[in-house]
C-alpha cells in the first residue's frame, strides 16, 4: 500500500471556530491510511498538537495583517513554489481564498478547492472592498467548490454556485446525546441551581455573533425570570466590551464567561435553551451540536433555514425586537420537552460525521485518480 494523499488545508489558525471544528471532525474520522491532512496557517491554534499527533504537518506564514498585502502575496508565492508537491489544496478562507488559490495555481497544484463557510464578510467598508477584490480571483483559480449551505455557496461563488457541492457540517452524534447526570454535574461545577433557567451561547466574541443584543435579551428576561443564567462560551476581540456591558447592567452574578472550552458536548447538557442572534452565518456547527443534544434553539432569522434539522427544536426570530425573544424564551421554558432525541433524525438529514468523512474521503480520492 502506498503513502496517503496529503491534502493541504489553508486557514488562519486552527482554533475552535466552526470551520476548524468541522476540519478536525473530518480529520478524526477520515481514513488516514489513504488521506492525510497538512495545514498552512498564520498563527498558532489549540488544535495544533492534535494535528501533529494524527500525523499532520503544520506550515506557517505571516498573515496579511502582520506584513501587508504585498508581503502576504510574496509569502504565498514562495510557499507554494517550495511545496508544489501537493496535489490538493483546500482553502477555508472565504473571499481570501482567492489569493491562496491563485498562488497555488501558479505553482502548478492541480486540485484547488474553495470552501465557503459564511454568507457575509466581516469588517468595515475598506476591508470588505479588499475582500471582494481577493474573492474575484476564486472563479479563475478554483477547480472545485464546496459550501456548508446553499446561501454560503451563492455568496462566495456567485455564478459558480450551481457547480458547488454541499458538504454538511457533520458531528459525532453519540457525543452529544443528552445525559441528565452530566447536566447536573456541569450545573454544579458552574454554581448554577438545579431549578434555574439557563440560556447558552457558543461562539467567538465578534460583531457577527451579536453578543450585545444577546445581553439585552437576557437583561429583559432577568426582570421577569429572577432564577435565570446566561452562559457564554468562547473568546474574541469584543469579549472585554461585552464584559463591561454586563457590569454596567449589574448582571455579573448571572452571566458566566467560560472562555474557549473543549467540552462543548458536556456544556450543552446544562443549558435549557440555545440562543443565537447572529447577523449572518454559513451553517453553524454549534447549532447542529445543540440540536444533537435535544436543545431548543432560538436563532436569528438571518440564518439559513437549512440549519433546521426538522426535530421541532428551532425557531427563527427577528433581531430588531428583544421582547419577542423574551416572550419565546418564557413560553419554551414552561414546556417540559424531552431532550432525548433519535440519532436517526440527524442521520437522515446527513449530519452524521461518519457520512461527511466518507463523502470527503471519496471526493479527495476521485480528484487525484
What are these regions (language model features)?
Residues 59, 140-181:
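Donor nucleotide-sugar binding/catalytic pocket of nucleotide-sugar-dependent glycosyltransferases
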Residues 40-41, 296-300, 306:
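Short hydrophobic beta-strand element within catalytic cores of glycosyltransferases
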Residues 66-71, 154-158, 170-189, 195, ...:
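Acidic anion/phosphate-binding donor-loop and adjacent secondary structure
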Residues 2-74, 79, 237-239, 363:
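N-terminal strand-loop element at the rim of the active site
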Residues 20-25, 197, 201-220, 237-243:
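A conserved mid-protein helix/loop that constitutes part of the nucleotide-sugar donor-binding site
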Residues 260, 279:
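Aromatic "clamp/platform" in nucleotide-sugar-dependent glycosyltransferases that forms part
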Residues 91-97, 116:
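Short His-centered aromatic/hydrophobic patch
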